Each structure stands twice: as structure tokens, then as C-alpha cells.
A protein has these predicted regions:
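Alpha-helical scaffold domains
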Residues: 1-97
């Protein structure tokens, strides 16, 4: 995915995960997962937005969106125990980490 290399990739990813179009949501979560895997940590606002959108996606009906969101959450947790605890708290009762 070439989008991971442009400086505005996070902006696009956050716009896409907030979309109501499944293909955009999947692409947005996949892009965020790739950015997280590359070590690009989100800021506080990004963390809140990501976890809010992931919670909505994980409770939705589209299996592709759920899968992409779950992968992104797991990549987010790879940043360390603090990030894992944040995700665990935000997704309690929705997604088991």
C-alpha cells in the first residue's frame, strides 16, 4: 500500500474509518494498521477517534470491516502495555484483547 508513505496518510485513514462505506472503512483500518506497524503512534485525539470508530465497527454487521478493525486494534496494542490497557478499557465488552 503506497498510501502509507505519504505524510497525509493518517488524515485519509481517519476520514475513511468514519465513512459509512464499507470499502472505505476497510481501507482506512488497513492503512492505520500499516502505519501502526511502521511505528507511527497516534496522538491523544487520534487514539480516541480510532478506538471510537473501532468500537462502532466491531459492533457492526460487516465482517470485512470487523476483521480490518480487529487487525488495526491488535497493531495498536503492539505499541506496548499502556496502549493495550487503553484499548482494553475502550473496547471492554466489545472485543477481547
Amino acid at each position: 500500500n503506497l498510501l502509507q508513505y505519504v505524510e497525509y496518510a493518517p488524515v485519509i485513514a481517519y476520514q475513511w474509518i468514519a465513512s459509512n462505506k464499507p470499502l472505505y472503512e476497510i481501507a482506512g483500518f488497513q492503512l492505520l494498521a500499516r502505519l501502526f506497524a511502521n511505528g507511527k503512534e497516534p496522538n491523544d485525539r487520534g487514539i480516541n477517534e480510532f478506538l471510537d470508530q473501532a468500537a462502532v465497527a466491531l459492533q457492526g454487521d460487516n465482517m470485512g470491516v470487523k476483521h480490518a478493525a480487529a487487525n488495526a486494534v491488535m497493531r495498536f496494542c503492539d505499541f506496548g502495555e499502556d496502549f493495550e490497557n487503553i484499548a482494553r478499557g475502550a473496547l471492554k465488552g466489545i472485543f477481547e484483547i
